[in-house]
Design a protein with these regions (language model features):
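Cell-envelope/extracellular polymer assembly enzymes that use nucleotide-activated donors
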Residues: 2-4
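Conserved sequence signature across two-component system core domains
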Residues: 9, 33-35, 59
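Short, well-formed alpha-helical segments that are part of the catalytic scaffolds
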Residues: 10-26
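Acidic helix N-cap motif at the loop->helix transition within catalytic regions
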Residues: 14-18, 39-48, 96
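Residue-level signature of catalytic and energy-coupling elements of molecular machines
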Residues: 23, 72, 90
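A conserved acidic beta->alpha catalytic loop
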Residues: 34-43, 91
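Acceptor/aglycone-binding surface of glycosyltransferases and processive sugar-polymer synthases
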Residues: 59-78, 83, 95-130
């Protein structure tokens, strides 16, 4: 199974570098989509330009997270990846959980798999199975 991590970002220059560095400890290949950021996001991405395992897709105007995800998934497929794990660039997702999601996908007996991770699925009032 050929995985990459997809990181859509919009004006998350303060957290993006840390998220990329943490992601690289658990996944070799990253696709970052810069969704028209106007802060220092492009500068942060530039510090990773030597890393050939990081692909950056940028466009000048913000088009929303959904657009960024679609474009990132398309780029991941073009690069030959079979699976993508998405991680938000603001720090609300933990890159260290990526191997857990990859393992679930590997253990599935399906040709197409969607694995959703959530820290809140066992919260009070939530059904045991969603």
């Amino acid at each position: 199974m050929n995985f990459c991590t997809l990181i859509p970002t919009y004006n998350n220059g303060k957290t993006l570098g840390n998220i990329i560095e943490r992601t690289l400890t658990v996944c070799n290949d990253i696709v970052v989509v810069n969704d028209g950021s106007t802060d220092n996001t492009a500068e942060i991405l530039g510090t990773f330009s030597e890393n050939k395992n990081i692909t950056v897709v940028s466009y000048p105007n913000n088009k929303g997270k959904g657009y960024a995800l679609r474009l990132g998934l398309q780029k991941a497929r073009e690069l030959g990846f079979d699976y993508s794990v998405t991680v938000d660039s603001d720090g609300q997702h933990f890159p260290e959980d990526i191997p857990l999601l990859q393992e679930e996908a590997k253990n599935a007996n399906e040709s197409r798999v969607l694995v959703v991770g959530s820290r809140n699925l066992k919260a009070e009032g939530m059904p045991e199975k969603n």
